[in-house]
Amino acid sequence: MSDLSPERFKLAVTSPSSIPESSSALQLHHSYSRKQKSLGLLCTNFLALYNREGIEMVGLDDAASKLGVERRRIYDIVNVLESVGVLTRRAKNQYTWKGFSAIPGALKELQEEGVKDTFHRFYVNENVKGSDDEDDDEESSQPHSSSQTDSSKPGSLPQSSDPSKIDNRREKSLGLLTQNFIKLFICSEAIRIISLDDAAKLLLGDAHNTSIMRTKVRRLYDIANVLSSMNLIEKTHTLDSRKPAFKWLGYNGEPTFTLSSDLLQLESRKRAFGTDITNVNVKRSKSSSSSQENATERRLKMKKHSTPESSYNKSFDVHESRHGSRGGYHFGPFAPGTGTYPTAGLEDNSRRAFDVENLDSDYRPSYQNQVLKDLFSHYMDAWKTWFSEVTQENPLPNTSQHR
């Protein structure tokens, strides 16, 4: 946390800076491909999957497979969420879900930590200034004193290079960078809007290596995307330079998250191909209702096409009057024997129905084709003659003798 006063913070917010990469990154964010890969959209989908009742554990491998991204992208989101208390690390690639209700407590802790950090840095700077004045007086009185005696003093501080290296290594952490970024807003009432460039200068310092500075600015921009998707900050721009900036909104209740259209289409494809069986009951209800409708339609058609008994008997009598009686009708060489037709009464004016089993047993026609009868009798006589000759020449062995 920086030890700048509120007046200097105001100047830092409104002062222009020269980092063109951040503005170009914001322009790329509005393109289609960049938007689909942004951490903001990914965080919205992540929260839509896990911000609901019944979720206690979050697995990074499971989240990466459901969202269709690499696990390192999930790490970025989890680090930011962990810094504001939404998640807590439990094991490797396993996190405990705390929810948005833990955000106010985490922000309060960050505010208290930021105030203590500001007071500590102010106290250290005052001590360093006093020790520098004493060192100047001693060096003027003893110009040839060795550096070892200075380092052996009990009140001397360690060299500034070592703690700066430690701080630089710690600030590479995305979670720590997120906490320091939030402290800029909650530890000073003067700051409510800050540009991305000024936040990078306050948190990262003036780096001489431009490539390292670009990387750190991109990391800070990813943090801002995640916090913006959580409605903690809002993307805006400065009034003087129109550069990208961020406005602090704070925690105003739990927001509502919905899956993106791409993931919704993916879920619909899964249901279509049978990998998701949540719509089995719907399919069964549809099939049962359709079968009932088809059965009803068939019954209506049968009633519509059914012939009353009186009309059926009338048409049958007309047919007999045209072709004569059943006894006088000639069926050709295959004349059926005399038989009676079933005279069972009709029910519900439906079509006359014949009993198939009774037809097979009682009303089997007896064909009287003399030519075929003579031919079959000739074949039977020939077979009997051949069989008698064969049995006489080769008599069958007596099976009783072998017993």
From Swiss-Prot:
Bias type Low complexity, positions: 142-152
Please describe what this protein does.
Answer: Inhibitor of E2F-dependent activation of gene expression. Binds specifically the E2 recognition site without interacting with DP proteins and prevents transcription activation by E2F/DP heterodimers. Controls the timing of endocycle onset and inhibits endoreduplication.
- Give residue spans, biased composition: Polar residues: 153-163
Q: What is this protein called?
A: E2F transcription factor-like E2FE
Q: Per its UniProt entry, which superkingdom is the organism in?
A: Eukaryota
Q: Where does the protein end up?
A: Nucleus
- Write out the GO biological process terms: DNA endoreduplication; negative regulation of DNA endoreduplication; regulation of transcription by RNA polymerase II
Similarity comment: Belongs to the E2F/DP family.
Q: Which UniProt keywords are present, listed alphabetically?
A: Cell cycle, DNA-binding, Nucleus, Repressor, Transcription, Transcription regulation
What cellular component GO annotations does this protein have?
nucleus; transcription regulator complex
Indicate yes or no for the key word Nucleus.
yes
Native species: Arabidopsis thaliana
**What are the DNA-binding region positions?**
34-99, 169-250
Q: Write out the GO MF terms.
A: DNA binding; DNA-binding transcription factor activity; RNA polymerase II cis-regulatory region sequence-specific DNA binding
Without the gene, what phenotype results?
Answer: No visible phenotype, but increased ploidy levels.
